[in-house]
C-alpha cells in the first residue's frame, strides 16, 4: 500500500505541471473618458493580447458601475462564444440595446450600447479570462481587465452649450456686420452721386447745343445795299407719331426790306455760254460776295418758316 502511494506521488511530481497564472494585456478603447450625446449609439472595443497558450479560449465579461455605485455584471461571452445577459440587462428591452460581438477571434471584442440614456452614464469594465483544458479539466491560466468612463450629455445641456457658442460667435461677428453695412451704404451713395453728375452734364450739354435764331447784319456791298440774313441753329423739332402728308412749299412774298429792281420783273436763269475772251480786270474793280445757303428744316404745321429770299445786285465800279 505504501509503495502504491509513493508511486502516485512520484508520478504527480514528474508529470507536466500547470503554468503559473499570469496576466493578459487588456485594453479598452476609446478611453479613459468618452462623451456621447443622448440618443446616440456607443461602441466600446476590448483588445486582448499576450495569451499564454495558443489553444486556449477566452471568456469575456463586461461590468457596469453607475456613478457612485458598485459594478455589476452586464453581459458575458463564454469560452464557447455563448452570450449571456445578467441583471437589468436580461430583460428583452435592454437586450436589444446591448450587443457583444467578437470582431477577431481571441483578439478583439466589441460592445455596443444603442440609444444611450442618461442612466447609461458610468464606468464600463472589460474582464477577460484565458481558459484551457488540463487533465480533462478547464483551468484558468491568466486574466486581465481594463475600464473606461462613459459620459452621456443630455439634449438640453447640448442645446444650451450650442446656444452659448452661437451667441459668442454672433457677438464676435456683429461688429463686422455693422461695418460691412456701412461700407455698402457709402458705396451705394457714391454710385448715386456719380450717376447724378453724369446726368446733369448730359442735360447741360443738350441745353448748350440748342440753336437759337439770330439776325446778322452784313456790311453794305458794292451797290450800297444792306443784306439781312437769318441764322438758324435750332435743333430739329420732335416728329409726331403719325406721318403728315407732304405739302408743296409755296415761297412767301418777298419782304419789303429787300430792294426790288425796276428793270427785272422775273429772275432769269443763266444759260451756259461760249467762252469769250474778256479783258483782264484788276482785282481792285472786283467785288466778292459769299452767300451760305442752309436748307431749312421741315417746319411743323402752323409754324412760320424762317427762310428769307433776297435779291442782290452787283455794280461794277468805274475807274
Curated annotation (Swiss-Prot):
Entry-linked Pfam families: V-set
Signal sequence range: 1-23
Subcellular location(s) of the protein: Cell membrane
Primary location class: membrane
Keyword Cell membrane: yes
Domain Ig-like: 24-154
Source organism of the structure: Mus musculus
Known glycosylation sites: 25, 41, 143
GO annotations of cellular component type: extracellular region; plasma membrane
Bilayer-crossing regions: 180-200
Protein name: V-set and transmembrane domain-containing protein 4
Post-translational changes noted in the entry: Proteolytically cleaved to generate a bioactive peptide.
GO biological process: endothelial cell migration; endothelial cell proliferation; retina blood vessel maintenance; retina vasculature development in camera-type eye; sprouting angiogenesis; vasodilation
